[in-house]
From Swiss-Prot:
Pathway membership, UniProt: Cofactor biosynthesis; ubiquinone biosynthesis
EC number, as in UniProt: 2.1.1.222, 2.1.1.64
PANTHER family the record matches: METHYLTRANSFERASE, UBIQUINONE BIOSYNTHESIS O-METHYLTRANSFERASE, MITOCHONDRIAL
Chain sites annotated for binding S-adenosyl-L-methionine: 44, 64, 85, 129
InterPro entries: SAM-dependent_MTases_sf, UbiG_MeTrfase
CDD domains: AdoMet_MTases
UniProt keyword list: Methyltransferase, S-adenosyl-L-methionine, Transferase, Ubiquinone biosynthesis
Organism the protein comes from: Enterobacter sp. (strain 638)
UniProt record similarity statement: Belongs to the methyltransferase superfamily. UbiG/COQ3 family.
Function: O-methyltransferase that catalyzes the 2 O-methylation steps in the ubiquinone biosynthetic pathway.
Single GO MF annotation: polyprenyldihydroxybenzoate methyltransferase activity
Protein name, UniProt field: Ubiquinone biosynthesis O-methyltransferase
First-tier enzyme category under EC: transferase
GO biological process: methylation
Length: 242
C-alpha cells in the first residue's frame, strides 16, 4: 500500500488536535475550559446572521466546529448546517449534544481541503472561527473556504493578531493570569496579522466586506464587538457573483 500522505494531509497539526481531544468531554460545560466560547458565541452568531441577511433556509458550513457550539446555534436559526473537524472526540460530543437537543447538524471528520474537493461552491455561508491559528497552513484553509462558497455567498473568519498586545492578552492574560483557557492553548507564532489574512483573501475570489475586533474587558467581565483589531478580530468576506 502506498504510504504517502494525501495532498491535504499536511495541513493537520496532531498536537493541536490532541489538545482539544483531551478536554472534549467538557465542551458544553458552561463553566469549563470552553466558557469563553460559550460567552462570545452570541456575538459571533449575531455578526454572522446580520451580515448574511439571516441564516434561515441557508446551507452553512462550520469549519473547525469542535463540539458544535456555533454549529448548533446556526441550526437553531433555521440553517442547514454541516460541521467539519479533524478531532474524533469533539465530533462525538457534538453529535451527542445535537441529538439530546433535538438539533439536526451533519458532523463530518475531514479536512476542509478534502471537503472542498467534493463540495465546491455548495454553501451559502462558510464560517471558520478560531481555527486558522491552529493549523500549519492557514492560507490553504482560506483557499478551501473560498472554493466551498457559492457565488455571492458569505465567508467569515476569526483569529488573533500577532503582536505584543495579543501575546499579553491572549496568552499571558487569558491562559496564565485569568485562566480563561488552558495553558498552551495558543502559540503566538501561529497568530495571524489582519494584513496577512487579507492578503490571502485577495488571492481568491473573495472580497473583504467588514472587519471588527472582539474585545474583552476584565474589569466588567464583558465581551463586545468594536473597532480595533489588535487582538481578536473577525472578518466578513463575500464571493463574487458570476
Amino acid at each position: 500500500m502506498n504510504a504517502e500522505k494525501s495532498p491535504v494531509a499536511h495541513n493537520v497539526d496532531h498536537a493541536e488536535i490532541a489538545k482539544f481531544e483531551a478536554v472534549a468531554s467538557r465542551w458544553w460545560d458552561l463553566d469549563g475550559e470552553f466558557k469563553p466560547l460559550h460567552r462570545i458565541n452570541p456575538l459571533r452568531l449575531g455578526y454572522i446572521a446580520e451580515r448574511s441577511g439571516g441564516l434561515f433556509g441557508k446551507k452553512v458550513l462550520d469549519v473547525g466546529c469542535g463540539g458544535g457550539i456555533l454549529a448548533e446555534s446556526m441550526a437553531r436559526e433555521g440553517a442547514t448546517v454541516t460541521g467539519l473537524d479533524m478531532g474524533f472526540e469533539p465530533l462525538q460530543v457534538a453529535r451527542l449534544h445535537a441529538l439530546e437537543s433535538g438539533i439536526q447538524v451533519d458532523y463530518v471528520q475531514e479536512t476542509v481541503e478534502e471537503h472542498a474537493a467534493k463540495h465546491a461552491h455548495q454553501y451559502d455561508v462558510v464560517t471558520c472561527m478560531e481555527m486558522l491559528e491552529h493549523v500549519p497552513d492557514p492560507q490553504s484553509v482560506v483557499n478551501a473556504c473560498a472554493a466551498l462558497v457559492k457565488p455571492g455567498g458569505q465567508v467569515f473568519f476569526s483569529t488573533i493578531n500577532r503582536n505584543g498586545k495579543a501575546w499579553l492578552m491572549a496568552v499571558v492574560g487569558a491562559e496564565y493570569v485569568l485562566r480563561m483557557v488552558p495553558k498552551g492553548t495558543h502559540d503566538v507564532k501561529k497568530f495571524i496579522k489582519p494584513a496577512e489574512l487579507l492578503g490571502w483573501v485577495d488571492l481568491t475570489w473573495l472580497k473583504e466586506q467588514h472587519i471588527t475586533g472582539l474585545h474583552y474587558n476584565p474589569l466588567t467581565d464583558k465581551f463586545k464587538l468594536a473597532p480595533g483589531v489588535d487582538v481578536n478580530y473577525m472578518l466578513h468576506t463575500t464571493a463574487k457573483n458570476d
